[in-house]
Amino acid sequence: MMRFPRFTMGGEIFIMEAPKNLNHQELLQKLDLVGCGAVVSFLGITRGHDHGVEIYRLEFDAWQDKLGNVLRLLAETAIESFGVSKVAMAHRTGPVKAGENIVSIHVASPHRKQAFQACEWLIDELKIQAPIWKKEVSEHGEKWKAGLG
């Protein structure tokens, strides 16, 4: 795990590396929620199927030297753009079986509207900007997917 001690405009950021077993509750507990009236969370899970094809697992490869920095910059931008107080994020790397957690994002804020907006923006931008690649292993074999979406 790595915690970036950076505080932005009163905001706290926590980024966790998650090569195995992403525990979203543990990630949420890293945030000090004093002064927050809302927490909005997103938990991405491997579906196990895609257009009728059984998916056994997804395999995520990441540019580890850059991943933490990209997630931190996304969190900083969310704090500054939406006025939220705290952000915690983690994304799995390696194999992730059907039904297992892939990504967890928690956004804490004095008010819910900003937390919802920031959380949605964070997952959308993570899928675009994070240096992570996804391989799908299914009943039809293996294939690299374009983007994380």
Where are these regions (language model features)?
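N-terminal, polar/charged subdomain of small-to-medium soluble alpha/beta proteins
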Residues: 2-101, 108-149
